[in-house]
Amino acid sequence: MPEGPLVRKFHHLVSPFVGQQVVKTGGSSKKLQPASLQSLWLQDTQVHGKKLFLRFDLDEEMGPPGSSPTPEPPQKEVQKEGAADPKQVGEPSGQKTLDGSSRSAELVPQGEDDSEYLERDAPAGDAGRWLRVSFGLFGSVWVNDFSRAKKANKRGDWRDPSPRLVLHFGGGGFLAFYNCQLSWSSSPVVTPTCDILSEKFHRGQALEALGQAQPVCYTLLDQRYFSGLGNIIKNEALYRAGIHPLSLGSVLSASRREVLVDHVVEFSTAWLQGKFQGRPQHTQVYQKEQCPAGHQVMKEAFGPEDGLQRLTWWCPQCQPQLSEEPEQCQFS
């Protein structure tokens, strides 16, 4: 599923439509009837971790105070949530996002349970409704264009993907949402202290979570502490920190955990910057056969016995597994 940096790019693409009225709808969604959005006004959009939220109102003037502006490309270690420079991404006409079709199979990370936040269709006439968009494996948002088939399916048909939701706006443009779950919510699920791309990200909370007596690769995917972090960021941060994915957090020194969190934030921020600047993503170990040092990369699915197994890439030489004895701090 799209990770935090890509979902923030989706947010950037949707933001220019804030303040416009939905004049026509379409899509294959069964749980949410696209027609229920007809004539509503898109008044706000927010992004939190891997989730995108869209606020719809009945009237043009009912937008909430302090509506979220489009996030700017981060210039510092932590993503800032201010206004974006339109020159870096351009106008919405003809733009579309990359759908990440080259990725291997991804599953929902541990701790990302949608059930407690979902509601039934919002009552008719209820102002301030938030549409919660949870993206699937190849989830994407397209602007003023539709996704096209890149290859034939198993039956040999060149059938274009079917959008889950299409919103046409009074300004003439439209948005198409693919491979996603749509549900109404009374308000966005907001926990900025666990969002790895938020300036309010709580490092202390993340470091404490990493100290648990379980493999660090499990903890990194726990959205309660690392919202927006997915399999790509997990693999790349662990490699850059030189930590074996199955190393128990409880045996890592405080300094090693600090380094790991640093790499999580740095890689995520660089990925987001690249999205805004049109630069391709470069990975060192994810889906690689060799690491930058020329060593053979191992691949295996890891996860809790009662949880989801996620494909993991690591270099046994650059990321040696630690014993279960805590690391000792060295003083010079």
Swiss-Prot record:
Subunit field text: Binds EP300.
The organism's taxonomic lineage, starting at the top: Eukaryota, Metazoa, Chordata, Craniata, Vertebrata
The EC number(s) this enzyme carries: 3.2.2.-, 4.2.99.18
Composition-biased stretches (Basic and acidic residues): 74-84
A Gene Ontology term for the protein's cellular component: nucleus
Free-text comment on this protein's domains from its UniProt entry: The zinc-finger domain is important for DNA binding.
GO BP term, example: depyrimidination
UniProt keyword list: Acetylation, DNA damage, DNA repair, DNA-binding, Glycosidase, Hydrolase, Lyase, Metal-binding, Multifunctional enzyme, Nucleus, Phosphoprotein, Zinc, Zinc-finger
Residues bearing the modification Phosphoserine: S68
Record family assignment: Belongs to the FPG family.
Compositional bias ranges of the Polar residues kind: 94-104
Binding site for DNA: N231
Protein location: Nucleus
Protein name as annotated: Endonuclease 8-like 2
GO molecular function, one term: damaged DNA binding
Domain of life: Eukaryota
